[in-house]
């Protein structure tokens, strides 16, 4: 039986997209990479009034992205998170699982081209909504 936390219907995606206000972006890129989805998707979210919290994997010297303080781990981000938007290769998502589970966001979104069913199952079992292999910017434009 499919988990109710594995969001796969258009209705479930629409409902999630409409309620996000605060998003941590795991694997965000810097302004120097403005042509890459890991920068321009969070830039779009920021431009429509969603609070974007940068959690880059690289760029140890960077202190801010999109004018927001950078955090190195999900658990270090203060306050609740509506969503963690993940820009990591499918095979690399699992190395962030414990950090994401410890933070307990309401939902996790694996961007277009990113799918890891083992991670999605663990998140769903913890009561965290999961979307895989979809672009948050495309779905936000469509439904919000």
Stretches found by the model and what they are:
Residues 2-88, 94-144:
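Structural/interface elements that position substrates and couple domains in central-metabolism enzymes
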């Amino acid at each position: 039986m499919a988990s109710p936390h594995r969001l796969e219907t258009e209705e479930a995606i629409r409902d999630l997209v409409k309620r996000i206000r605060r998003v941590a972006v795991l694997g965000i890129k810097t302004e120097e990479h403005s042509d890459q989805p890991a920068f321009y998707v969070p830039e779009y979210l920021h431009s429509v009034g969603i609070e974007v919290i940068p959690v880059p994997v690289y760029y140890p010297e960077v202190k801010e992205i999109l004018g927001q303080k950078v955090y190195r781990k999900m658990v270090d981000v203060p306050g609740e998170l509506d969503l963690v938007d993940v820009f990591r290769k499918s095979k690399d998502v699992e190395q962030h699982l414990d950090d994401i589970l410890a933070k307990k966001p309401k939902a996790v979104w694996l961007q277009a081209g990113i799918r890891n069913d083992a991670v999605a199952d663990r998140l769903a079992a913890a009561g965290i909504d999961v979307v895989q292999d979809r672009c948050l910017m495309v779905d936000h434009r469509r439904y919000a």
